[in-house]
Amino acid sequence: MKAFLKIFGALMLLVGSGSLAHAELTIDVTKGIQGGGIPIAIAPFAGGASENIAGIIASDLKRTGKFAPQSPDVRADYAVTGQASPGGSRGYVVRFQLAGAQGSQLLNLSFDVPPNQLRPVAHRISDLIYEKLTGEKGLSGTRIAFVTAGGGSWFLVIADADGQNPKVILRSTQPIMSPAWSPDGSRLAYVSFEGRRPQIVVQEVYTGARRTVSAAPGINGAPSWAPNGQRLAFTLSKDGNPEIYSLDLGSPNPVRLTNGSAIDTEPVWLPDGSVVFTSDRGGSPQLYRIGPGGGAAQRLTFEGSYNAKPTVSPDGRYIAMVHQRNSRFYIAVLDMKTRQFRVLTSGGLADSPTFAPNGRMIIYSDGQRLNAISVDGGVKQDFVLRGRARDPVWAPYSR
């Protein structure tokens, strides 16, 4: 069997080797911007709300690696104040203000929310502050999905980006692999081994409704959503060796995109509808690109003898991947505009990268836990989970 399929199989076995995790996550920022971040004073919110809104905002901003939250009595570049009081039509009115060092008002907004939405609105405030001061969309209000296993079961889990509010949306006595979010964040496609054979399933996140979209003989693997959310690309071996197929979700018949004697697998879509995938057609696993309907493949990677598990940033600018060097595995990124190739991580067991919806962070697993690193390598986060977690995927922004 080809080398990278051997590694794929070994990683499959590892998924089931950890103890049961109840998906309790905490996140440590292990590397931030030089200088410790932008000082920002955050005062406790008045009004006696059950959630510590100021504390959530401070944690969110600290986790970005770009801010250094301070107590309100410390001189800082920016200051956040607010109130969360019973009232309004939904239960609570939350107001906040962001001011500059000279007292200039930068933001002054209010939200009418039910009591169970105080934490989400705190994340919303964090993202508004982050975007106002950096020019980039924030990630505090987003979600992640991942797989964990133990006790003879596998779990597909969704949690907030800060690791809170984990929810198991699927429990199975057979492996679960390769979750992928739909572009609107309402569905997850994944590989399930129910019935002791691989099949590709699409599950509605909010209702739990499930639909098997491919259960062909042999391999059914690595589902990836098209940008319009109406198609999936995945790997099938029903006609012999693994090839890339595309399926219109309104049709039962997948269309074959690659055709040859090589192993073609792990497809992901670019915004223009073309597909990047892993193939050993050149003698070792490398990344290639084909058009929306297939055709001639263009090789994209030439650094080293192993580049696999591609993931594409939302704007198509970057492709992150697993890069092998000296028998160890790292996360690397290829700039599609400049063709610059950079290795971002220093560990040796990196796997399964996916981009955050703002394209600035990449989440991945390292064999024990989840990690995230910025595209420029300047910010690194460790997700501390009780037990092992694999196959992380960052959800898109809510629409």
PLM region spans:
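A structural "domain/chain start" motif
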Residues: 22-63, 150
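Short acidic low-complexity segments
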Residues: 66-76
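Amphipathic beta-strand/beta-sheet edge segments enriched in Tyr/Trp
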Residues: 74-128
